[in-house]
Amino acid sequence: MSTIVIDYQTESIPDDWLYPAEWRIQRWLDCALTVLAIDEALEVTIRLVDNDEITELNAEYRGKNAPTNVLSFPCDWDLPEEPRLLGDIVIAVQIVNQEAKAQKKKMEQHWAHMTIHGLLHLLDYDHIEEKEAQIMEDLERTILAQLGFPDPYCA
């Protein structure tokens, strides 16, 4: 059975902002690893940020001077110890909450989707090419269905 250790960084987020409890993040990632049949000890950092910080990161690492919902930074160090460090998932709290409201989705559903989306990027899935996007979206649908959430791509 896989295990995932989470370093959940929420220090820079005001107390009155809405975001999921760490146990929910843990549940979503555990489910994803089970569906993906990954059987190793892993570690991931989940960092929650505001629009300014996500915009800076998006500009620096993707050349896009605009906010985005989630960024993933895979760890490229080949470290021998366990758990294996996968990398960082950076989530923009305001963006994710605004998207959920605009798309008329439950907050928990959209947060689960964005968290799983970020994890899949750390595991080397991508959506640049249409074929890759279909594979990634199908995995997201499967994992979210296991968690009891509807298809995130249906209106």
Curated annotation (Swiss-Prot):
Query: Any keyword Phosphoprotein?
Result: no
Note describing how the cofactor binds: Binds 1 zinc ion.
- Specify the protein name: Endoribonuclease YbeY
Keywords in alphabetical order, please: Cytoplasm, Endonuclease, Hydrolase, Metal-binding, Nuclease, Ribosome biogenesis, rRNA processing, Zinc
Q: What does this protein do?
A: Single strand-specific metallo-endoribonuclease involved in late-stage 70S ribosome quality control and in maturation of the 3' terminus of the 16S rRNA.
Compartments annotated for it: namely: Cytoplasm
Q: Does the keyword Hydrolase apply?
A: yes
Which family does the similarity line name?
Answer: Belongs to the endoribonuclease YbeY family.
Q: Name one GO cellular component term.
A: cytoplasm
Task: List the SUPFAM superfamilies.
Answer: Metalloproteases ('zincins'), catalytic domain
Q: Which Gene3D superfamilies match?
A: Metalloproteases ('zincins'), catalytic domain (3.40.390.30)
Could you tell me one molecular function GO term of this UniProt entry?
zinc ion binding
Task: Identify the enzyme class.
Answer: hydrolase
| EC number assigned by the record | 3.1.-.-
What biological-process terms (Gene Ontology) are attached? rRNA processing
Q: Which InterPro entries match?
A: MetalPrtase_cat_dom_sf_prd, YbeY
Cofactors required: Zn(2+)
Q: Which residues bind Zn(2+)?
A: 117, 121, 127
